[in-house]
Every structure is written in structure tokens, then in C-alpha cells.
A protein has these predicted regions:
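Boundary at the C-terminal end of the N-terminal hydrophobic targeting segment
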Residues: 12-18
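Short glycine/acidic-rich loop motifs that flank beta-strands on beta-rich extracellular proteins
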Residues: 70-74, 92-98, 128-135, 156-163, ...
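Acidic Gly/Asp/Thr-rich repetitive segments characteristic of extracellular carbohydrate-active
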Residues: 25-63
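N-terminal extracellular ligand-recognition/capping segment immediately after the signal peptide
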Residues: 34, 56-97, 125, 129, ...
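Short, T/G/N/S-enriched strand-turn elements that build extracellular solenoid repeat scaffolds
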Residues: 43-54, 70-79, 109-112, 160, ...
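Short, recurring structural edge motifs at helix starts
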Residues: 69, 104-110, 195-202, 227-230
Length: 282
């Protein structure tokens, strides 16, 4: 297993240089990338490296030293890769429409082949109330993805995280806090479990095995779920376990065309509605 580490050097006059190094199992430095507080290029190059070198026999990790950073361009995730944010605070500073992290989109990906075995953990992703109306994290056609111990903050007229036609995705011990939106013009689920039709997804199942566990949803318009449906096409095996929903403007859980649902151990505090269910569009 190879590990990609990020370290920072702080100079007395306030200028910061971040070094992103590629290190093998023997702790030999293979590659080094440098940046200031704008970590976009360094992270992008690290992800390019994992894209070209990670595989099921060689799982790689990108580790960022603790700090506050800006991302000014969408970073595309790679398979067989973990990103350890290491308690860092990363802000969306995109001047145009764009996410902080997104699954690959450089070609057509049938089934669940866009992204597999990917982990993001241990840090904060701040939407920064960026007016580009983009999700902080967007995953499509992805499989075996885990988001753990990540705080999502301050989304503007979109979702903190959006899943579109994914399988085996888990959010564990995450926080979703802060949102500006308008339910008259935007659906506003903090975690949207969306759906793609056959044109996008070649007729394959929309969702399977999505787990939201030990998470906190606070000061958002809607918590988790979807508002879209296609007749006779279900999202299956959805689990929402031991979560806390607090100060929810509308609905904490929106389950439209969900099948084989497990919802238990959740707390609802100051929510307009705890849960909404609609089967097959009815």
C-alpha cells in the first residue's frame, strides 16, 4: 500500500507552503507537490497520481496536514483511494459553478463504474455559502464509497451531498449544518438520494444499499431523501440509523419510492415533519 501525505511549512512572515508527497510502503518519497492556502493544484495532482496508480491490489491514501485551505476548482475523486482530511477545514472558493469533490466524469461510466472503493474522512468541507449553487460533494455511478467523520457546512441553494445512481454508499458519523435555500424553487435535501433515468443510467437499478448512520442534520431545510420518482423504479435497501435531526425547516426524512427501508433510533428535534413517504408516485 502506498500513502500520499500532505505536510505544511509555516514561515514567520505568514506565508504557507503545503507539500503533498507520495510515499511508498518503505516511506520513500516518490512525488512532492507544493501549494499555499489554495490547495487545488496540489490535491488535483495527487488525485491524478492515484487515478493512474491505484488499483484493487494497491489502495492509496491522500493525507492532508491539518490546516485551512481553499479549493477553487472541482476535484475529481479516484477509485481505490482514501482522502484523510486530517482535521483540515476546506472551503469552496470556486468562482464558477463547481463542487469540492465529485466522482469522475471524463467519459461515460455504465453501471456503477465511475468510482469504487473510495473513502473521505476526518475533516470539514465548507460550502462557504458559495453563490454558485453547487453541491459540496457529488457522486454518480459510484460503488463502495464511505464518508466518515466529515462535517459539511453552509450550503447555498443546493445539497451538502448528492448521490445519483450509486450502490453501497455509507455516511457515518457526519454532520450537515447550515443552509440557505427556498423550498419554492429548490428541493434542498442536505443529503439527496437522487435518481437517473435510463438515458443516463442504461436501465440499471437506481440505488441499492445506502446507509446514513450516526449523523447529525442541523439548521437545514430537509434532512435526507429524495423528491423525485420514476414509476416502478425504486431505491432499495435504504438505512437511516441513529441520526439526529434538529431545526429542520421542512421534512427530516423524505422517502419517495423507497423500498426495504430501515429507519430506527433517530431523534427529531424542532422539525416541521419527521418523515414523508410516497410509494410509486402516490
Amino acid at each position: 500500500m502506498c500513502i500520499i501525505f500532505a505536510s505544511c511549512i509555516f514561515f514567520s512572515y505568514g506565508f504557507t507552503i503545503c507539500s503533498v508527497c507520495v510515499i511508498n510502503e518503505n516511506k520513500n518519497v516518490l512525488k512532492s507537490y507544493y501549494s499555499t492556502s489554495d490547495i487545488t493544484t496540489a490535491l488535483s495532482r495527487a488525485l491524478d497520481y492515484t487515478k493512474n496508480n491505484a488499483n484493487k491490489y494497491n489502495f492509496l491514501t491522500i493525507r492532508i496536514s491539518k490546516g485551512v485551505y481553499n479549493v477553487k476548482k472541482t476535484l475529481h475523486l479516484s477509485s481505490y483511494t482514501a482522502i484523510d482530511l486530517n482535521k483540515s477545514f476546506i472551503k469552496n472558493a470556486n468562482y464558477e459553478r463547481g463542487n469540492i469533490f465529485k466522482s469522475p466524469e471524463d467519459k461515460e461510466y455504465p453501471k456503477y463504474s465511475s468510482l469504487t472503493r473510495c473513502i473521505i474522512k476526518n475533516g470539514t468541507l465548507d460550502g462557504n455559502f458559495n453563490r454558485n449553487k453547487s453541491c459540496i460533494l457529488r457522486l454518480c455511478h459510484s460503488n463502495n464509497v464511505k464518508i466518515e467523520n466529515v462535517t459539511f457546512l453552509n450550503n447555498y441553494y443546493s445539497h451538502h451531498a448528492e448521490l445519483a445512481s450509486c450502490q453501497n454508499v455509507t455516511f457515518y458519523n457526519c454532520v450537515f449544518n447550515g443552509q440557505l435555500s427556498n423550498l419554492n424553487v429548490n428541493s434542498s435535501e442536505a443529503v439527496q438520494i437522487d435518481i437517473l433515468d435510463r438515458v443516463h443510467f442504461f436501465g440499471f437499478t437506481s440505488y441499492d444499499n445506502i446507509t446514513i448512520e450516526n449523523c447529525v442534520f442541523k439548521n437545514v431545510y430537509r434532512g435526507v431523501g429524495t423528491h423525485n420518482y420514476f414509476k416502478n423504479l425504486y431505491q432499495t435497501n435504504i438505512k437511516i440509523l441513529n441520526c439526529t435531526f434538529e431545526n429542520i425547516t421542512d421534512c427530516a426524512i423524505s422517502a419517495v419510492n423507497f423500498k426495504n427501508i430501515e429507519v430506527k433510533g433517530n431523534k427529531f428535534l424542532n422539525c416541521k415533519y419527521s418523515a414523508f413517504y410516497r410509494d410509486n408516485g402516490k
